[in-house]
């Protein structure tokens, strides 16, 4: 949870992964792998679809949570499709670098898609949203607060506002440097 990845969700994930229970075992090994939903992701995806906007990463997360909730079906299927596990061959340093690239690029794309949906809604409903102000407001404390919200605010405050956040110079260059590692996974 340092540098470019610093965010609330990474922070709480790291805390969960590090936490040990009373017996000294990791808590993560005792958490049921069946997630529920409150509906905000689903609502976001439905709204994006109604506006004709892609929100692929969030949609995938919603679908994966739905699949996660089907624990009995997954258990049954895993018995039907057992395979021989092999030891993966990889360079640990390269793997860590590629995971960083994939995670950071995915976060950038997810935020870019979300802000594109906000812009489309603002245009469609004549809301006159100030996307830079929204980014600054989210920095202060919400579930999606992240260190690069500063860069998002700066992009929307630039004299030549981008048509899409990924086309803003900072984000374009970040994605270019991350693309190879992201694709390798």
Residue map of PLM features:
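C-terminal substrate-binding/catalytic lobe of Rossmann-fold NAD(P)-dependent dehydrogenases
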Residues: 1-185
